[in-house]
UniProtKB/Swiss-Prot annotation:
Intracellular or extracellular location(s): Cell outer membrane
Entry-linked PANTHER family: MEMBRANE-BOUND LYTIC MUREIN TRANSGLYCOSYLASE C, SOLUBLE LYTIC MUREIN TRANSGLYCOSYLASE-RELATED
Signal sequence annotation: 1-17
Name the record gives this protein: Membrane-bound lytic murein transglycosylase C
Any Pfam family matching the protein: SLT
Taxonomic path: Bacteria, Pseudomonadati, Pseudomonadota, Gammaproteobacteria, Pasteurellales
Enzyme Commission no: 4.2.2.n1
Keyword Amino-acid biosynthesis assigned: no
InterPro entries the record matches: Lysozyme-like_dom_sf, Murein_transglycosylaseC, Murein_transglycosylaseC_N, Transglyc_AS, Transglycosylase_SLT_dom_1
SUPFAM superfamilies for the chain: Lysozyme-like
Residues lipid-modified (S-diacylglycerol cysteine): C18
GO molecular function, one term: hydrolase activity, acting on glycosyl bonds
Family: Belongs to the transglycosylase Slt family.
Length: 357
């Protein structure tokens, strides 16, 4: 029951983001739509409970693509972190075959796919998963013929089943992505990363490290905090700062942030804001980088409060420390365990992209 309640709470911002492209005041819109949103959330959860059973609710997240089809009787799940694709159905094998094909050939335009609706995902002439998955012959799956052939192979040779708590039987197939699937996705966005790096003076490896940590280069990424896209920009907080920097009012919409070019530009411009406004005064470049990474996750105020409640004095303390000391404090003393781990993960990822140059 606790798990179910947590997932329903997680669904609230997800459903709001997927059911609205409004770019007005988030807080007002959210408050006004509370009753309708509660109804929508409850209906979705109830549908999944009735069809799949208790504790089978699965929704999209930062590093997981989840799409229901066939009136929620079929679903596709891509774990971009683990490199695993699972497609399962409570319907017949024909529906599973169709879901396999549509998943393998889906495009990269997150704006064009409603993750909350239960319709089929459009087949794209430029599938997003090309280069990340191969068929049983080792071929790239880039057209309908190869996808159909591979789907037939999977159903004939790798079909599995499991029993749900409600007594229903699920048929499913699992597909392992290639070993370097993360790097394949990263390369898709290199040109956009380089443009943003030059525009804002932020190191490419830092941008890539943050993208990997935030979304594992999942263009459909959305979180319980309503963060969206590759760099997980929250519209009503960082989004407002970003628009203010650009001389625009309001906040970015869902469709704006699900555009990879806009999302990367937004995320990198926020790094610029952290560096040149909120954390301005930190003199050591390495200490600044550590502070920026931690602040991207937890906010600049939270980072500075680790050192002192007075922001100016906190910056002076940081400047008297060696970068290694700043790193150690942010990864051990920061009150948020998520923020502590975040700096560790981004720093490790950034180092790997530096070596890859």
């Amino acid at each position: 029951m606790k798990l179910k309640k947590f997932l329903v709470l997680l669904l609230i911002p997800f459903l709001y983001a997927c059911s609205s492209d409004r770019s007005g005041n988030y807080d007002d819109a959210f408050a006004k739509d509370t009753n309708g949103l509660d109804l929508l959330t409850g209906q979705f959860s109830q549908n999944i409970d009735q069809i799949w059973g208790v504790n089978e609710l699965l929704v999209a997240s930062r590093k997981d693509y989840v799409k229901y089809t066939d009136s929620y009787y079929t679903r596709s799940h891509i774990s971009f972190e683990e490199g695993q694709i699972t497609i399962e159905t409570l319907a017949d094998a024909n529906r599973l075959h169709s879901a396999i094909v549509h998943t393998l050939l889906m495009g990269s335009d997150a704006k064009g796919i409603d993750l909350f609706a239960s319709g089929d995902v459009p087949i794209s002439s430029r599938p997003f998963l090309v280069g990340q998955v191969v068929d049983n012959f080792g071929r790239q799956i880039n057209n309908i013929d190869v996808a159909n052939s591979f789907a037939s192979y999977l159903l004939q040779n790798r079909l599995q089943s499991r029993r749900l708590s409600n007594g229903r039987t699920v048929q499913f197939v699992s597909i392992q992505m290639i070993a370097n699937h993360v790097n394949v996705r990263a390369r898709k966005y290199l040109s956009l990363v380089r443009q943003a790096s030059r525009r804002y003076g932020i190191d490419e490896s830092l941008i890539l490290g943050i993208m990997q940590t935030e979304s594992s280069f999942n263009p459909y990424a959305i979180s319980y905090a309503n963060a969206m896209g590759l760099m997980q920009v929250v519209p009503h907080t960082a989004g407002r700062d970003i628009f203010k920097l650009k001389g625009r009012s309001g906040q970015p919409s869902k469709s704006y942030l699900f555009d990879p070019a806009n999302n990367i530009d937004a995320g990198v411009s926020y790094l610029w804001i952290l560096k040149n406004e909120y954390l301005a005064g930190i003199t050591n470049p390495t200490s600044m980088r550590y502070a920026m990474i931690s602040a991207y996750n937890s906010g600049a105020g939270a980072v500075l409060r680790v050192f002192d409640s007075d922001q100016e004095y906190a910056i002076n303390i940081i400047n008297r420390m060696q970068p290694e000391q700043v790193y150690r404090i942010l990864t051990t003393v920061h009150p948020s365990s998520q923020a502590r781990n975040y700096l560790l993960k981004v720093d490790k990822a950034q180092r790997s992209y530096r070596r890859a140059r």
